[in-house]
Amino acid sequence: MSSLFRKKPLETLSAQSKSKSLARTLSAFDLTLLGIGCVIGTGIFVITGTVAATGAGPALIISFILAGLACALAAFCYAEFSSSIPISGSVYSYSYVTLGELLAFLIGWDLMLEYVIALSAVATGWSSYFQSLLAGFNLHIPAALTGAPGSMAGAVFNLPAAVIILLITAIVSRGVKESTRFNNVIVLMKIAIILLFIIVGIGYVKPDNWSPFMPFGMKGVILSAATVFFAYLGFDAVSNASEEVKNPQKNMPVGIISALAVCTVLYIAVSLVLTGMMPYAKLNVGDPVSFALKFVGQDAVAGIISVGAIIGITTVMLALLYAQVRLTFAMSRDGLLPGLFAKVHPSFKTPFRNTWLTGIVAAGIAGFINLGTLAHLVNMGTLAAFTVISIAVIVLRKKHPEIKASFRVPFVPVVPIISAGICLWFMYSLPGVTWLSFVIWIAVGTLVYFLYSRKHSLLNK
C-alpha cells in the first residue's frame, strides 16, 4: 500500500525543470495573454446579460468581484507552486511531490478528460458561430456536416468543429513560439473588441438603468457569484507552461495573477456598461452584448462583436490543447502513460506526436459526439484540481519548508482551506449526472493505474 503514496523526489523535479527538451521562449506577457485567451471565450458576451436579467441585476459587478476573489485564492496556490516547482504538468506534478503517486495520477487523469471535453465543446460552439456568420452571407454547409448525430435533424458529423481543432493542432505542433505569436495576436484583437464595446456603450449609459441596483437582494448576488465563477475557469492552463518559460520563478506568478486580474476588470467593465445601456430585465437573450448595441442603434458595432466571439473562442481552443499536451507529456515522462506522449520533435521542440494524437481524438469527439451534459465535467474537473492544489500547498509548506518561492500564499493554512471549501461547495452544486460521470471516469482511471501506470512508473526504478 505504501507504493500508492510514494512521492516524486524534489531532486528529480529539479532536474526535469532544468531539462532543455522543451524550448524556454515564453515571457510573463505571453503567459498573461495565454491565460486571458483561455478564460475569456463567449462567456463575456453571453453570461453577463443572462445573469444580470435573472439573478443579480446591475449588482452583477459585485458577483464578478466575489467570484474573482474566490478564484484568486486558488490562483495564489498555483502561483506559489509554479514559482517553487517550475515544471510541466500543473497540479498533477505538484500533487506528485506532496500527496503521492495515486492521487497525482487520478488528478492528472481527471484533467485529461476535462481538457479534451472542453476543447471539443468549445469547438462545437465555434462551429455554431461560424455557421451563423456564413448564413449572414447566404452561405450554408450541407446539413449532414453541421453537427454531431442527435444534435439536429439529419446531422452526422460536425465538420467545422473538427476542422478548426485540426488547424489549431497544426499551429500548436509547430512550436511554442509560433503558437504564442498566433495566440498573442488573436487575444489582443479580442481585448480590442471588448474595449470597443465598452467605449461605444459607455456613451449610451443611463444611470437610471442601475436602479434598483440589487433587485434580487444579496442572496441573488451570492448565487450569481456561484454562476459566474465558472466564467473564470481556465487560468490554471497557464501553469502547464512552466518548462517553456524564461525565468519561471518570476514570470509564472506574474502571468497567472495578471491574467486573472485583467479578466476580472474586463468582466466588471462589460457588466457595468451593459446594465447601464438598457434595463437589466431585457438582457435575458442569447447575445445580450449585440442585443444592447442594436437597442441603441449601433448595428455595425454589434456585427463586429459577433465576429469577436468567433475570434475569442479560437484562443480558448489553443490554450486547452496546449495544456492537455503538456499534462500528458509530464505523465508520460514519469512512466504513468506510454512513452509516445513524451517524445519531443527534434526541430520543433514540441511533443509533436502527442499534439496530433490529442488533436485528432478531440476532433473526432467534436465531430461525432453530442456532448450534452458531459460539458459539466469540465467544471467538475477544474474544481477538483483547485481543491487538490489548495491542500497540496499546506503539505508543501509543512514537508518542504526549505523550498524557496518568489511568491508565497498569504495566511497559510487559512487561505488554502477557504479556497478548498469554496471549490467543494461549488462541486456540491453540480448536477447528479455530472457526479456520476465523474465517479465512473475516476474508477476507470483507478483501473488504468493498477493495470499499467503503477508497474511502469519511473519510481519503480
Curated annotation (Swiss-Prot):
GO terms for molecular function: amino acid transmembrane transporter activity. Keywords: Cell membrane, Membrane, Sugar transport, Transmembrane, Transmembrane helix, Transport. Disruption phenotype: Disruption of the gene leads to almost full resistance to trifluoromethylthioribose (3FMTR), a toxic analog of MTR. One of its GO terms (biological process) is amino acid transport. The chain crosses the membrane at residues 33-53, 56-76, 102-122, 152-172, 185-205, 213-233, 254-274, 301-321, 355-375, 376-396, 409-429, 432-452. Involved in import of methylthioribose (MTR) into the cell. Belongs to the amino acid-polyamine-organocation (APC) superfamily. This is Methylthioribose transporter. It comes from Bacillus subtilis (strain 168).
